[in-house]
Amino acid sequence: MIKWPWKVQESAHQTALPWQEALSIPLLTGLTEQEQSKLVTLAERFLQQKRLVPLQGFELDSLRSCRIALLFCLPVLELGLEWLDGFHEVLIYPAPFVVDDEWEDDIGLVHNQRIVQSGQSWQQGPIVLNWLDIQDSFDASGFNLIIHEVAHKLDTRNGDRASGVPFIPLREVAGWEHDLHAAMNNIQEEIELVGENAASIDAYAASDPAECFAVLSEYFFSAPELFAPRFPSLWQRFCQFYQQDPLQRLHRTNDTDSFSATNVH
């Protein structure tokens, strides 16, 4: 019998949190029992250290809080929760939100416009999310808003700005940049052939190195079968950085499903 650490009745608060139900989303089905236990331990600490702030009437219950915490902690399962030290609040809108955006064109003119955002990650500031896209992050589709924004936070640990190169040994930076830019070029070539909507990888990955790292981090965890065979060298670098192999988890899940199917009477 498995003794889950989060089932130990250390406090009324801990026993009230529905961790087992929170784990029952497609994205997390490939985790071993040991990985689930470790992830929940990190998520408990995350909820103790971070403040989840619902906005515009969004109702944040314990199950939603647990699932948000689990997704935040999945990328740092082996890195450690200290990798998420760069923020203290998570702001959660009920749906994509409108922000005022300021940008400068090629001749130096500054423009202001209102744009719809799914999420934002501020340097040494909060992470901003919306619940509709968080819900869409529970499956294994290649889209994951929380992992995308966490990747930006991990990226900025290597400097003042997100560059697409997380905090890795200096000797590995050149190889990482080479493989990341090769992936960007490959994605851009596909976009030019079939268009953004038909591309097999989110076209946003081709916009700049920081977004490429964030988008491919989404695919790394939620659609490894698309990432690994297409960019095998970069895949290995991601595995080394995150110290995880989601493709192995996927194969393990598929093997379990196949075994169960063959034993149905």
Curated annotation (Swiss-Prot):
GO CC term (a single one): cytosol
Keyword RNA-binding: no
UniProt-listed InterPro entries: MetalloPept_cat_dom_sf (IPR024079), MtfA_enterob (IPR057256), MtfA_fam (IPR010384), MtfA_N (IPR042252)
Keyword annotations of the record: Aminopeptidase, Cytoplasm, Hydrolase, Metal-binding, Metalloprotease, Protease, Zinc
Annotated disulfide bonds: none
UniProt entry tagged with the keyword Metal-binding: yes
Pfam families attached to this UniProt entry: Peptidase_M90
Signal peptide residues on this chain, from the entry's feature table: none
Main location: cytoplasm
Any GO molecular function: metallopeptidase activity
The protein's required cofactors: Zn(2+)
Details of cofactor binding: Binds 1 zinc ion per subunit.
Binding-site residues for Zn(2+), renumbered to this chain: H111, H148, H152, E211
Top-level EC class as recorded in UniProt: hydrolase
GO BP term, example: proteolysis
Enzyme Commission code(s) on record: 3.4.11.-
Annotated function: Involved in the modulation of the activity of the glucose-phosphotransferase system (glucose-PTS). Interacts with the transcriptional repressor Mlc, preventing its interaction with DNA and leading to the modulation of expression of genes regulated by Mlc, including ptsG, which encodes the PTS system glucose-specific EIICB component. Shows zinc-dependent metallopeptidase activity.
NCBIfam families per UniProt: PRK15410.1 (NF011939)
Protein name per UniProt: Mlc titration factor A
Provenance organism: Escherichia coli O9:H4 (strain HS)
